[in-house]
Amino acid sequence: MHRAARPTVKSRATAAPSTAATWAVIALFVAARVFMLLAQPWASEDAYITFRYAWHLAHGNGLVFNPGEWVMGFTSPLWTLWCALGITLGAAPETWAQWTSLLFGAWALHTAMQQLARHASRTSAVAFGLAYALWPLFSALTASGLEMEFLFAGMVIAGTQVHARGRGAGVALGLLALTRPEGTVAALVLACFADRRARLVGGAIVALGAGLLAWAYGSPLPHSVLAKRTLYGTPGPWVGRHWLDWLLPLPMLTHTAAREGAHLARLGWLWLPAAVLGVPAGFRLRATPVAWIALAGLTVWAGYAALGVAYFWWYSMIPVVTLFWLAALGLSRLPRWATRWPVLAAAALILALSWLDLFPVYLGRAQNEFRTFHPIADALRSRARPSDLVMAEPIGLIGFVTMLPILDESGLVSPETLQRRKLGDGWYTDLVARRQPRWLVIRPAVLATGEAFAGRGRPFRDDAGRLAILRDYHSVWPVAPAQSDALWLMERRP
């Protein structure tokens, strides 16, 4: 059987970037990642949720957060299994996740530069390589222990394999779909350009994975995703404008949810024109993986904005990397004299200087999590019995360090919490009365104001519910008064 011929669209380049340029960019990539890893050896709070699932699997308890409770509170099946492999091999999950993320990122970078040089231009390849190597967000994601670089590597590898009509195309598509929900969307986009065999193989892998997840958890959809949708909703594009408005270099109109968007908005005069030029450049290359990968990223980005997905800083990986991808394509549209080393050198300087502003943001965020959550975890571990139930938020680092049974007040791993929060106010009072946890990990601001830290529904119906917690529980840590955003460890009175 003859394969259908793909439409022929001429590429502007047919050679890989020079070996010296490639290795120079990879050296910058490694240097930036290693610098961040040495400064921030601990992982992000949410990564520890995955690590606890992986730890239980590696120790024979199944892919669970609490032994015996089959709730899919992780977002990435494939990354969770990967972390379980590292634990089985004797590695600390933080070390395994961070340093293998670096390797996956380097693989993605090398492959992306090869494809951009082959189908767009060498300038595009080097420009994207510099952005991916030097923009601080990406180094922070490597250090986070989350699966975002793994996801991007999957997109690049799958797009490349689909274009090559390789035997690994279907496997790459199937595995990409199992990285995260965004990976499923990206895999569907890339599958539109795949041959029949790749679609069948990829579909079979997804069907097998979804079937196993449905068998174990009752649904192939992550419960964590359902919990976030319930707590934060999908309010639509106006509320979701924090995914788009940082494209404009107009700070007075910017509704950014965090420092990432504010910093990008200030540089919009540089990124936006290049990215706008990148759209027609991508259309010209529509028969190449360069365009397909861009389309996959744009689809995920548009989905975030259209649904009004709540902002979590690691979600910004795909929108920002897609912006840089399009900007790199746009550089190939500029006159030759404007795309040589002076422009790339200026871009590299801007990227490097961004560390002065953004490195303290990411390091401070990680330090704040660790210094706030770890002392609570140590205090709880030293006082609690193995069977003691803890009602807590956050649950990642505290849950991983203590390995105690957790009742999650956000509902990520506790369906009963989610069901009760759907009913409205008083959910905290009712859950404490029903489950009688010995320990509470709670923010003092919640007790002081009666307002939930996140999501729908007030925790107490009235002041009596709030006072009942203070009557039935007493604070055991910290000894000194805490700040409003700190945590209290409270024990049920005898």
Protein language model regions, located:
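Membrane-lumen/periplasm interface segments of multi-pass, membrane-embedded glycan/lipid transferases
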Residues: 52, 59-75, 218-280, 310-313, ...
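Transmembrane alpha-helix segments characteristic
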Residues: 23-30, 126-128, 132, 203-211, ...
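Hydrophobic/aromatic-rich transmembrane helices and adjacent perimembrane loops
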Residues: 179-181, 185, 269, 309-335
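Transmembrane-helix motifs of polytopic, lipid-linked glycan transferases
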Residues: 99-120, 124, 157
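Membrane-interface alpha helices of multi-pass inner-membrane proteins
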Residues: 128-136, 156-158, 167-181, 187-192, ...
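Hydrophobic, aromatic-rich transmembrane alpha-helices
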Residues: 27, 110-112, 187-194, 256-301, ...
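Specific aromatic-rich, kink-prone transmembrane helix
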Residues: 109-114, 131, 150-169, 189-191, ...
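Membrane-embedded, lumen/periplasm-facing catalytic core of multi-pass transferases
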Residues: 346-399, 405-445, 467-494
